Structure formats: structure tokens, C-alpha cells
């Protein structure tokens, strides 16, 4: 029987912090459905996020993101991998904090840079990181976002850990609040 202690498990963090991979690992263990915020936005808009920004602008994207966050946090028993920037929005953040147990997946800038480039210094740079030094931009963005990320209910370090190890750490924090089929 599902405990009322944990309504949803919501994973937030910077790009490449492991949200989607960890959500899959948790879902396998507790048999709760995994919902990826970015995937849900793409499905509803029927186009990639970059195209939403290009065709309709950031305001339209953020409005759709708020609707998606509200909808996916509205039901219980879900593992939610939030979009990389969705927790930065005040309304989204409050919806997530009210809708489940929020875990900030923390990673060092060097780890994020490696994951984004897959260790290839010539890999294409994600738009958020812009031109210039991607590692420096990651450091700047993490520093800007830390006051917001610190509002999550829990912080879990992901450096040097596999998605399964991070999932187990999260499930340990949740305790008997969710079923586990390991």
C-alpha cells in the first residue's frame, strides 16, 4: 500500500545532472510512472523545444511549461524529471514543492561539462551555454541558481555515482513512503 508520506518524487537540477536517467532508475524500482517535463512539453506542442522558442517565443514556452508542471504534479504516485530551468520559475517551484518531495540533483561544473560534451571538446554547445567557455558559463549559471536549488526538500550529490546509485540514495531518503521492488 502506498504511504501518504511521499506524493511524488520530483527531480530538479541543471542540465545533465541526471534527472531523466535517475527518474528511469527510480521508476524501475518502485513501479511508479516516470514523467519527463521536457518530453511532455514536446508531446503537447508537437514540436521540439527549440522550435517552440523560435516559432512562438519564450513567453509561450514558459506558459506551456507552467501548465505541464501543474498537470504532472497534480496526480500522485509519479517520478517526475523536471525540465532543467523549470524550478527557476516561482510558480513552477511552488507547484513542485507542494506536489511532492523535491530532490535537487547536484553535480560539479566539471561533471556537467563532461556529460554535456560526452568528453568531446568539439561537441556542439547547448544554446544555454552560448559562445565562449562552456565550463565557465556552467559555473556562472550554477552560482546564479544555487539560491533557488537550495529550496528543494533534499539535495543529492551525483558526482561519481551511477543513476542506480543516485536512485537508491533517493529511495533511502524516502524510506517507507513509496513501494520498492528492488
What is the predicted role of each segment?
Residues 2-5, 25, 29, 75, ...:
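NTP-dependent small-molecule kinase module
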Residues 98-146:
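A glycine- and Lys/Arg-enriched "phosphate-lid" helix/loop adjacent to the NTP-binding pocket
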Residues 84-86, 108-110, 161-162:
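Short glycine-rich anion-binding loops that position phosphate/pyrophosphate groups of nucleotides
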Residues 20:
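Walker A/P-loop
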